[in-house]
From Swiss-Prot:
Residues 149-163, 198-217 have a biased composition (Low complexity). This is Dihydrolipoyllysine-residue succinyltransferase component of 2-oxoglutarate dehydrogenase complex, mitochondrial. Residues 186-197 have a biased composition (Pro residues). Residues 71-145 form the Lipoyl-binding domain. It comes from Mus musculus (Mouse). The modification Phosphoserine is found at residue 82.
Amino acid sequence: MLSRSRCVSRAFSRSLSAFQKGNCPLGRRSLPGVSLCRGPGYPDNRKMVINSGSVFRVRFFQTTAVCKNDVITVQTPAFAESVTEGDVRWEKAVGDAVAEDEVVCEIETDKTSVQVPSPANGIIEALLVPDGGKVEGGTPLFTLRKTGAAPAKAKPAETPAPAHKAEPAAPAAPPPPAAPVLTQMPPVPSPSQPPSSKPVSAIKPTAAPPLAEAGAAKGLRSEHREKMNRMRQRIAQRLKEAQNTCAMLTTFNEVDMSNIQEMRARHKDAFLKKHNLKLGFMSAFVKASAFALQEQPVVNAVIDDATKEVVYRDYIDISVAVATPRGLVVPVIRNVETMNYADIERTINELGEKARKNELAIEDMDGGTFTISNGGVFGSLFGTPIINPPQSAILGMHAIFDRPVAVGGKVEVRPMMYVALTYDHRLIDGREAVTFLRKIKAAVEDPRVLLLDL
């Protein structure tokens, strides 16, 4: 028996040595009762000293291997240069199981909301920032303990099979009807002789009717307060900054939309078939604005208040205002001077879809040299837009209405749109602003102006 035990112990030692050297034919499977920490998943090898004098002692020897990467700390993603901090709104709580790429929290910045997904399948161990707390780029947000598989989705509860319905018993005999409740006083027999006193006009009820609620008569008046979100605070700050910094002045004109409507009606089907895009009016105004900005480069420039210099931009990046439930956002169409109508429509559709889904990145709204705001989609007839700093001008579009206009000495009904240009009078003179707006008017009313570069 002793010799057999020594043989088994010696064989076990050789097998264990071969296993640690990577020559074990069993691969990475461990022996019963022994947990080993060797393999590509563990960067450092944990050595074990095992007394091979008795196989029974080895049999009951155990160790616990903990991977260093089981618990990870997720940090705030890097923000753009124009964004310094944001507010955290948690979607998950401690102990919740999350799958890879599942949103754990949302960081609301001055310009947009950034979603922070889980980098792996796991369970949230700790939230390092309170709900509503302010964070900067690279701030630790939460710790996650990784698990091997995604959390199983809860199966819908099975509805139990309907039990066998028992035959309804014969209905019992209905109870005898209750005696009717007297709701009126019994009639008073009229006397044979007329009464000496005056007759009673009506019998007063024994109980007075319930009084109506005082609140219902006067009407309810209440109010409640909601904290401004960070985006609304930033919008208010920037608008007030523009009002305090810029010398804003607005000039107006009107655009005859007859030709552009006719062109759209004639080519919209072919445009949709070739580009898989609907041809709208915004692309015409964006392209016309780029054409006018090239003719009047001072409108595309900006004043650097720190150095007291005028910065002229050789590129044209046009911001298009998009209304969302959270507020107004202005994604940027870059290098518009190199685009055609199809490129502009495609970019507008992509940015608008991302804005409605709250998926705009901060980079999508950085920069911009000129802004277009279309209040006409809401039925606005007339308005004066506010400059989007640090830009120097903004174009306001409005609704299209049929109006009588004088054309060639005759009165005709034409589809007309009012347009407004608000500009920084510190940099742009009135002559340049009016010339710029007339260029836009000419390019929209007759797109051949763009082809002929007139």
